[in-house]
Amino acid sequence: MTILFLTMVISYFGCMKAAPMKEANVRGQGSLAYPGVRTHGTLESVNGPKAGSRRLTSLADTFEHVIEELLDEDQKGRPNEENSKDADLYTSRVMLSSQVPLEPPLLFLLEEYKNYLDAANMSVRVRRHSDPARRGELSVCDGISEWVTAADKKTAVDMSGGTVTVLEKVPVSKGQLKQYFYETKCNPMGYTKEGCRGIDKRHWNSQCRTTQSYVRALTMDSKKRIGWRFIRIDTSCVCTLTIKRGR
């Protein structure tokens, strides 16, 4: 149901002449999980600034509504059974594919966009001009995101604290697919490797640190039992602060 809904949404925006995105490239057609979508362009680049300004409000509201429906549909479709073989399909940072995914997970992008709109809580025009890219804003910590395979991870820690082996391939009806994990971690080559950006170093010690969250993956425990388990992967780069003593 979720995959069908995704296909309808992508087709809908692909057919619109005055869409917020000029193009939507869908890659990873062999994947069983959510395809990646990259969007470019604005209304002004399609029909000119006047036409764009007239339709911007209604289209933005429509897009937000579609995002909310998509996220609600994903929540309803999450399986309740612990050992369901489809469990990984409902984790936005996990994908089964025959090749390396070329884009971030779709739900990952939609959740980021929805969170941004909720936080802004402004008119459409103000939202556009409050885009961090337009204001030259920078992140407190520099992070990098990439797809990694089970061959890269090999082992992981599950929710019980035990070490499990992450299986590289998952059997499906037509063969096998690889497990891919979309990980985010602090950039060791970034400008924030020696401290967080924008922090007053006279009063604070700061450090950018990679944090982890749980995702569903096909694994094997120490007793050779294979099953779907929650494992920890790198999911964000955050700033930690400690006050300097003696001040």
UniProtKB/Swiss-Prot annotation:
Main location: secreted
Protein location: Secreted
Keyword Disulfide bond set for record: yes
Keyword Glycoprotein: yes
SUPFAM superfamilies: Cystine-knot cytokines
Record note on modification: Mature BDNF is produced by proteolytic removal of the propeptide, catalyzed by a FURIN family member. In addition, the precursor form is proteolytically cleaved within the propeptide, but this is not an obligatory intermediate for the production of mature BDNF. Can be converted into mature BDNF by plasmin (PLG).
GO aspect biological process, one term: neuron projection morphogenesis
Residue numbers covered by the propeptide annotation in the UniProt entry: 19-128
Disulphides: C141-C208, C186-C237, C196-C239
Glycosylated residues (UniProt): N121
Keywords, in A-Z order: Cleavage on pair of basic residues, Disulfide bond, Glycoprotein, Growth factor, Secreted, Signal
GO cellular component, one term: cytoplasm
Site positions for Cleavage: T57, S58
Signal peptide annotation: 1-18
Coiled-coil ranges (or none): none
GO molecular function annotation: growth factor activity; nerve growth factor receptor binding
Family annotation (InterPro entries): Brain-der_neurotrophic_factor, Cystine-knot_cytokine, Nerve_growth_factor-like, Nerve_growth_factor-rel, Nerve_growth_factor_CS
Family, as annotated: Belongs to the NGF-beta family.
Subunit relationships: Monomers and homodimers. Binds to NTRK2/TRKB. Can form heterodimers with other neurotrophin family members, such as NTF3 and NTF4 (in vitro), but the physiological relevance of this is not clear. BDNF precursor form: interacts with the heterodimer formed by NGFR and SORCS2. Mature BDNF has much lower affinity for the heterodimer formed by NGFR and SORCS2.
Function: Important signaling molecule that activates signaling cascades downstream of NTRK2. During development, promotes the survival and differentiation of selected neuronal populations of the peripheral and central nervous systems. Participates in axonal growth, pathfinding and in the modulation of dendritic growth and morphology. Major regulator of synaptic transmission and plasticity at adult synapses in many regions of the CNS.
Protein's name in the database: Neurotrophic factor BDNF precursor form
Protein encoded by which gene: BDNF
